[in-house]
Swiss-Prot record:
It holds the Pfam family Cas_Cas1. GO terms for molecular function: DNA binding; endonuclease activity; metal ion binding. It comes from Saccharolobus solfataricus (strain ATCC 35092 / DSM 1617 / JCM 11322 / P2) (Sulfolobus solfataricus). CRISPR (clustered regularly interspaced short palindromic repeat), is an adaptive immune system that provides protection against mobile genetic elements (viruses, transposable elements and conjugative plasmids). CRISPR clusters contain spacers, sequences complementary to antecedent mobile elements, and target invading nucleic acids. CRISPR clusters are transcribed and processed into CRISPR RNA (crRNA). Acts as a dsDNA endonuclease. Involved in the integration of spacer DNA into the CRISPR cassette. Homodimer, forms a heterotetramer with a Cas2 homodimer. Belongs to the CRISPR-associated endonuclease Cas1 family. It comes from the Archaea. The gene is cas1-1. The keyword Isomerase does not apply. Mn(2+) binds at residues 207, 274, 289. Keywords: Antiviral defense, DNA-binding, Endonuclease, Hydrolase, Magnesium, Manganese, Metal-binding, Nuclease. Its cofactor is Mg(2+); Mn(2+). This is CRISPR-associated endonuclease Cas1 1. Its EC number is 3.1.-.-. The keyword Nuclease applies.
């Protein structure tokens, strides 16, 4: 069988030794019913600690399973029968527990989206695929580590200033064009206040304050039929269409930002804003912050206001982000590496 599970499902099964939803026949396909406790513990140590709340793991357990890419989705087939298909933006890892085949296209897509592929032999992981294009120079990495020690707050402030400023620009656009009162001036005030804080904790606090104002404003712009109550990152069956579309958009944005970070020689795991954690591409998440609102949110808001039904159509959502402005993202990555190498001020991307 091939199982797709979230971190919450795994934790629930693991802690109770599968004495939970595993007992319900209708849900057995989604849990680790036949996995030994020893194997579960190994998987937990190897993969689960790095699993973001909005990602899933695909387990390949059936002998002879074949993974390929069809219509942009990672698809599992057994004897030419489709067992499941999943968007790469939803995946954190693919764990292969038995003899199976994986096409080179799956490996390519996994590389582009930062999906780990882990191979197990019995109860032991014996291989993990990492991107071949990962090629940062030693000089850049040393400077990046030095900047991480000495300029962490400076860079964190720049990333979040850019994020909040661009959120303000998005809400201000709708206020000016359609006469909404979205209290965008609060975001402008918070963005300016960020430049005066002195600690990373204060930066995160201002970001959280801005998020409340921003998503409240976004909610006012969306059709009520979408059921959007606020930003939710966790992947679940009950996720509203707009949040689901946001996750897809951010996943595709992450792919481009990751490529940009690697192309300029930076280490994607050494970030300034997001805390370091094994396997976490902290710098990619840092740089993404500036682009979330102008490159993802604004497009989806426009799509939802045009037709709420289009937000529920995955094909439409994917096509919406097929033309991400890669040039601007790569330019910003070069600006970041120059600021690190030359001890210059980093200027975030500011939408107009």
């Amino acid at each position: 069988m091939v199982h797709k599970v979230s971190q919450r499902e795994f934790s629930r099964c693991y802690k109770r030794n599968c004495d939970c939803i595993c007992r319900k026949p209708k849900q057995r396909r989604n849990v680790y019913l036949n996995y030994s406790l020893e194997l579960l513990i190994t998987i937990f140590k190897e993969v689960i600690p790095n699993l973001p709340m909005d990602k899933k793991i695909a387990f390949v357990k059936d002998y002879g399973a074949y993974l390929k890419v069809e219509k942009g989705l990672i698809t599992c087939k057994i004897k030419n029968q489709v067992k499941w298909s999943i968007a790469p933006t939803e995946l954190h890892s693919i764990v292969v527990l038995t003899n199976s085949s994986i096409s080179s296209e799956v490996v390519k897509v996994a590389n582009e989206y930062g999906i780990e592929i882990v191979f197990f032999n019995k109860h032991e992981p014996y291989a993990k695929l990492i991107p071949a294009k990962y090629a940062g120079s030693f000089k850049v990495w040393l400077k990046q580590l030095t900047a991480w020690k000495r300029r962490k707050v400076e860079f964190a402030k720049a990333f979040i200033y850019g994020k909040v400023h661009n959120q303000w620009v998005t809400l201000r656009y709708y206020e000016r064009k359609y006469g909404y009162n979205l209290t965008s001036q609060e975001l402008d005030r918070l963005a300016r206040e960020i430049t005066f804080v002195n600690t990373a904790e204060e930066v995160m606090q201002k970001e959280a304050e801005a998020a409340k104002v921003y998503w409240r404003g976004v909610k006012s712009l969306l059709p009520k039929s979408l059921g959007f109550k606020g930003r939710m990152k966790r992947v679940s069956d009950n996720l509203d269409p707009f949040n689901r579309a946001l996750n897809i958009g951010y996943g595709m944005l992450r792919k481009v930002v990751w490529g940009a970070v690697i192309s300029v020689g930076l280490n994607p795991y050494i970030g300034f804003l997001h805390k370091f954690r094994s396997g976490r591409i902290s710098l990619v998440f840092d740089l993404m912050e500036e682009f979330r609102s102008p490159f993802v949110d604004r497009k989806l808001i426009g799509l939802a206001r045009e037709s709420a039904d289009k937000v529920t159509d995955l094909k439409t959502v994917y096509s919406l982000f097929s033309d991400v402005k890669e040039d601007e993202i790569y330019t910003q990555a070069r600006r970041l590496v120059n600021a690190i190498l030359n001890d210059e001020e980093y200027r975030p991307y500011l939408a107009k």
